[in-house]
Amino acid sequence: MPDPILLTPGPLTTSATTRHAMQHDWGSWDAAFNQLTASVCADLVAIAHGGDEYVCVPMQGSGTFSVEAALGTLVPRDGVVLVPDNGAYCARILKILGRLGIEAIALPFGEDAAVDPAAIEAAFAREPRITHVAQVHLETSAGVLNPLDDIAAVCRRHGKRLIVDAMSSFGALPITLAGSGIDALISASGKCLEGVPGMGFAIVRREALDASEGNSPSLALDLHDQYAYLLKTGQWRFTPPTHVIAALRAALDQYLAEGGQPARGARYVDNCRTLVESMHALGFTTFLDASVQAPVIVTFHAPDHPAYDFRRFYDAVRDAGFILYPGKLTQLETFRVGCIGAIDSNDIRRAVAAIAQAVESLGIAVQRA
């Protein structure tokens, strides 16, 4: 039986080449593995256009581990962090800061609205104690893309430090760190780079990292110590996810061969366009306005019909070979379909056909061209 296609924002469908890269065992202290780590880190900084101003600090675990590591390492204990909040992953940052004992100020927005840089600027005027902003670039709850360049410009203008969760955008959307003033950008192996889950990373401004010694309350999640040890020895402080890194190396090779960010982004845009147009043809409507929709995951309004049941719908789509995101994060009844991974528009068309059949199996009519 073939593997299902994952229509989620990560983990996602990977290529056979990427999966094959995990067939080899690596010694974590061996020179060959050290070179593998170094090459991965160099490529990640290059993708972010970080130049010599930024370094990559890899971290074991999911992307959230690296988000917590960055916040705990780069924000001093007396820092005050503004968190523009338009979804679940912004809320997670607030929860992390609470656990770290760092003062946080939430700046709420609707889950269907992008963060407004002017509102951030107004928050600076109201709360001059703010030292940092922690911003999710692409809020995956509904698929909203926040205006990172404009937010970074506001932070630069007011001398505030910016930490960016780019979990679901890095590699697919254009990001240039050099000259941005961003202190750190965090992402992970199992997202738009199309690797497998298990490794996060922070691309950190050298000056910010150098100034962070002793900040982290954690041993394992201390980015400063992690990078210092890596710089000194070429090795990870603690056992690395060797197979995950080998898979990421293979995924990066494919990413570069495809044409890097412009080509990866174009494929995802094509997937997203195909998905939205095909779903509209069936009578489904999108939750977000097109102006804030990112080409990574699309939220659709669920059928307004008494026979609709998400679990039965999800199971029927799964039985047809496609895995949707299980459950809703928005306040309204919705479901989400991802556009990323080692898939193309033909896979999307087949997925939409499966969605149509699943809805009809519930006794709900859909439009047919």
UniProtKB/Swiss-Prot annotation:
Q: Which UniProt keywords apply?
A: Aminotransferase, Pyridoxal phosphate, Pyruvate, Transferase
According to its UniProt entry, the function of this protein is described as: Involved in phosphonate degradation.
Q: Which family does it belong to?
A: Belongs to the class-V pyridoxal-phosphate-dependent aminotransferase family. PhnW subfamily.
Q: Answer yes or no on keyword Transport.
A: no
Q: Which residues form the signal peptide?
A: none
Cofactor (UniProt): pyridoxal 5'-phosphate
Taxonomy of origin reads: Bacteria, Pseudomonadati, Pseudomonadota, Betaproteobacteria, Burkholderiales
Which GO molecular function annotations are given, in alphabetical order? 2-aminoethylphosphonate-pyruvate transaminase activity
Against Pfam families, the record matches this protein to:
Aminotran_5
From which domain of life does this come? Bacteria
Q: Quick check: keyword Transferase in the entry?
A: yes
GO biological process per UniProt = organic phosphonate catabolic process
Q: Which Gene3D superfamilies match?
A: Aspartate Aminotransferase, domain 1, Type I PLP-dependent aspartate aminotransferase-like (Major domain)
* Catalytic activity, reaction form: (2-aminoethyl)phosphonate + pyruvate = phosphonoacetaldehyde + L-alanine
Q: What is this protein called?
A: 2-aminoethylphosphonate--pyruvate transaminase 1
Q: How does it assemble?
A: Homodimer.
Which gene does this sequence derive from? phnW1
Sorted alphabetically, which InterPro entries does this protein's record hold?
Answer: Aminotrans_V_dom, NH2EtPonate_pyrv_transaminase, PyrdxlP-dep_Trfase, PyrdxlP-dep_Trfase_major, PyrdxlP-dep_Trfase_small, SP_NH2Trfase/AEP_transaminase
Origin species? Burkholderia lata (strain ATCC 17760 / DSM 23089 / LMG 22485 / NCIMB 9086 / R18194 / 383)
Q: What is its EC number?
A: 2.6.1.37
* Modified residue annotations for N6-(pyridoxal phosphate)lysine: 191
